[in-house]
Amino acid sequence: MTRAERQLAGHVLRHYPLALLGSVTQLARAAQVSSPTVVRLAQKMGFGGYPGLQGAVRDELEARLEGPLSKHDRWSARAPEGHVLNRFADAVLGNLQATLAQIDQQDFDAAAHLMADPARKVFATGGRITLAMAEYFVTHMKVIRPEVELLMPVSNAWPPALLEMRRGDVLLAFDIRRYENNVLQLVEMAAEQGAEVVLVTDPWISPAAAHARYRFSVQVEVPSAWDSTVAIQLLVETLMAAVQDLTWQSTAERMARLEALYERARFFRGRK
């Protein structure tokens, strides 16, 4: 890219997607480049011109904001023949394969090492639906290692939690469409505290990605009014397995102590 195109690209990335919703002239003026530079960059991105780029952005925004009713209508309009079990399973398997294919393994390993570092606390949070993923993660990670905490995505719970968050601690955040302001604000504040943010989001990318060190996008579309969390669950369980492998000596000791406590409390049904 030319210097002007790099300048334009930087402006678009900093102000995405709003930067691309105005006219060519407005974008050129805001980025301090010429109008032909805007058109040329759009063409280099594979579009016939700026209108094509704008159309793609608008389609993406519609997908980001799509609610349960419109999802159901869209899926039902093009549903193939066959039982819903088969159609749903096919979609989920496709999601898993696509998710695994696009995850950067080096980023995954780096995130696991951050979470395995005993010098760092680990926090997790999520939105209305994805908070369940954060809770699942925290429940297991508390066995794997100490100093793991669930952050509820409500503003009155943030200050005490952020007070305990040190520079270098890890925040695992989940945010899928329609993206929640509470999650974005919490991630932003944690990043300002110096936390290392690991974000799990969807193909349309949560705004919280701007504050994440590592970002993993998972496929979520299924023939339903709701997005699927199966691929998120896969990623969470794989992360936990990776951390467990890295900390196994201390984790095994913690598990042995926990099992002894469970046995003493007769927590599980089993031997009399």
Language-model features: where?
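HTH-adjacent hinge/linker in prokaryotic transcriptional regulators
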Residues: 1-10, 14-21, 25-107
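Alpha-helical scaffold segments in soluble metabolic enzymes
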Residues: 7, 11, 40, 52, ...
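Exposed, interaction-prone assembly regions rather than primary DNA-binding/catalytic cores
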Residues: 103-117
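Glycine-rich phosphate-binding loops that contact phosphosugars or nucleotide phosphates
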Residues: 113-234, 238-246
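A short, charged, Gly/Pro-tolerant segment at domain boundaries
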Residues: 249-272
